[in-house]
Amino acid sequence: VYVLLQHKHTARILFVTLFSYYFYYKSSGTYFFLLALVTVCDFFLAQLMARAEGYWKRKGLVVLSLSVNLGLLAYFKYTNFLGGVIASLMGGEFTALDIFLPVGISFFTFQSLSYTIDVYRKDIKPLTSLLDYAFYVSFFPQLVAGPIVRARDFIPQIRKPLFVSQEMFGRGIFLIFSGLFKKAI
């Protein structure tokens, strides 16, 4: 389907983004709304950051992005740990909260931060399309297992024309079958 849509950029990006969100939904349930929240928040913060005049306005927006992202990450990863530590230091008891750790939260949090930091440093210009940004943050091959890809490395590739030569196709098929063979052994 992706190759059939090779001349329709928006349809191709929409297709992959929807499937990325679907796969994330299947692994994390309604926590895919968290992925959407981080995506929308950082997209608009980067837009504001690019238009902001003055050092302190830009700095404030990047600090807001850091606070939102790291705050969510800290809540899901460290609330029970810190609650237990504080309770033991105070000589009390702590009942762990029922907090489900969303799959890949560290990866998409730091990937989204990479974008806002790159925009803050003026290494890249902010994307004008929320869909392109959602594609970058939710790209399923790296969403749940990494690696974290820098925005300045990934984003320029989004608009590149899709071209697959016979040699590239053959190499891809070879790598897929090699991987399947290695898994079977």
Name each model-derived stretch.
Residues V1-I185:
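Membrane-embedded transmembrane alpha-helical bundles that form the catalytic cores
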